[in-house]
Amino acid sequence: MSNCVIEAVLIRDAHYALPPGAGTDSVHINSEYCLAVTLLKSCQGFLGTGIALTLGEGNRLVCDAIELLARPLVGMEIEELMADFGTMSRRLADDPSLRWLGPHKGVVHLALASITNACFDLWAKSRGVPLWKLLLDLSPEQVVALLDLSYVEDVVSRSDALAILRAHACNRAARESILHSGYPGYDTSVGWMAYDNDKVRQLLDKAISEGFRAFKLKVGSTDEQRDLRRAAMLRERVGDDGIVMFDANQHWNLEDAIRMGRELGKFKPLWLEEPTHPDDVRAHVVLARELAPVKIATGEHIPNRVLFKNFMQSGAMHFVQADCTRLAGVSEFITVSLLAKRFGLPILPHVGDMGQIHQHLLFFNHIAMGQEVLFLEHIPHLREHFAFPAKVSGGRYHTPTEPGASCDLKI
């Protein structure tokens, strides 16, 4: 393997207008997706691409933070960097001139997500393999060397992480069939808040014809009866065998979340997502108790492994919606996946990357650590902007074959 040295860090502030109504929910009403893009230029000509999602003008703040945070990477050889990436990740996260802005959350952590994802993309490209294969080819020791386990050692220590990976190494072949069958998806794009019922029905029928069997609807309207009418329409349209989820995007206080959760529970959802403020662990504990048997899903706004640990320890979540564009990238996503495995919880990522990177990570999670196969969220709105958009057909994500993490953007 020849040396692949990072020569320069380039940054792109990418904004994409969405079709009217797309991307809207109870809190976020603008139809725009933005990506804070890190580009690692190497001496061999490879370009490592990393992304973090935002929804508007704040994207430039993340780009500014990338410029400040990524400076230590220039001049580093990618194999040497990734051989002990956990140490570098902690060094960047604890930069003494920037840590005060977090720590481990907000603009600086989103910047670290983009930088980290670019490192993994460059690493996979330099080896000529897709990210899922690069990760599966690593030994348990090499995987653990990628991780910053600080502040979660009380639950998953280095020896615990190694034990999980080693325990599932002997029977990995039995799970590799997922690479041929593909990973099941669920469709979020049918149920945006601004869509009227006719639009939802039209998109549902299209998604069903494309092989999807699970669908998410945005709730948290100022008109609660509208939420209930839309929920009834969704359940009627997909039938008793279809799977539905409801997403409030943090709109309700605890009292409203309990009341509306009970009403929406009549439509037998797989989960109720982000029912209240994403930092309120105690409120989620109460909701998990009061809304049973309805399950609680959250994670897209949980910024780090420590808060995920707290949610899991408290029994405040049933479905873990970690996002490698919100966490500190691929490496912290793997750490959260190990935490979830420890607590027996499934990982169903929020796709701030539109599923591009997460498809690799779920193939890895299932094969390497025996994570249950459930669903990967599908949001197709940026497909035309990716050089290698995720291959989705028959309601499944099919295994990516191109080298890298699938987040190259068309310039």
Predicted regions and their residues:
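Short, small-residue-enriched loops and turns at beta-alpha junctions
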Residues: 193-195, 220-226, 248-255, 273-281, ...
